[in-house]
Amino acid sequence: VINISRSKFFKKAKFIYCPPFTLLDQFVKKTRNTKIEVGAQDCHFVNGSGPYTGMISANQIKKLGTKYIILGHSEKRSDGDTNQIINKKILISIKEKLKVILCVGETLKDKKNKKEINVLKTQLNSCLKNLKQKKNIIIAYEPVWSIGTGRVPSNAEIYKNVKYIKNFIKKKFKNKNIVVLYGGSVNQKNIGILKKINNIDGFLIGGASQNYNKFIDIVKKTII
C-alpha cells in the first residue's frame, strides 16, 4: 500500500482499497497520511445492536475511519443477498455517510437469454429504492460470468450496458454525473483494450490487485 502511494502514477489516479474486515483498521492507519482511501467489502443489513453474531455493521465500519463500502458483489448475492437486502444495506451505509460501490451485472444464463438490460434494470430499481439522491453512490458493472474466469465481454457489450446504467441514473436522479466502474477479470493483459471504452470511469480490480507488480502494471497501462 505504501509503495503504491509513493508511485509516480499515484497522482494521476484515485485508489480505493477494500481489504477483508480483519485488515480494515491496519489499512486505515497505514494510509492515514496518503490520498489512498479505504473501503469495506460488505456490512450487515441491520445497523443497531442485536443477535447478529459474526456480523459487522455500517456504523462499526464507519468508526474505523473507513469511507467506502462495496455492496451487492456477485459473491455476496450467491450467498443469499437479495436486491431487497442490498437495498437495506445501501440505505444504512448512506445514513452512516459511507460512499457505496454498488455492484450489478448479469449471469451467463442471463447473457445467453439476452436479458442483460432487464437484469440491470431490476437490480438498479430494487437496490436504489427509497434513495433520494445519487450522492455517494458509485456503480460497478461486473458481469457475474466474467468474475475470476478470465472471460471478458467485448468492449461494445460493456459500452452498451454501462450506457444503460448511466442513462438509468440520469433519469432516476436527474443527474448525469455518475461514476461507473467495470469489474470482471481485469488484468495487465486486457487493460489496454478495456481502457478504450470511453464511458467507463475506472475499474474494480479483484485478483490482480493482490500482486503489487501486476497491479502497478495495470495502473501504468491505464494511465499511459
PLM regions and their residue ranges:
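Active-site loop-to-helix "anion-binding N-cap" substructures in soluble metabolic enzymes
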Residues: 1-224
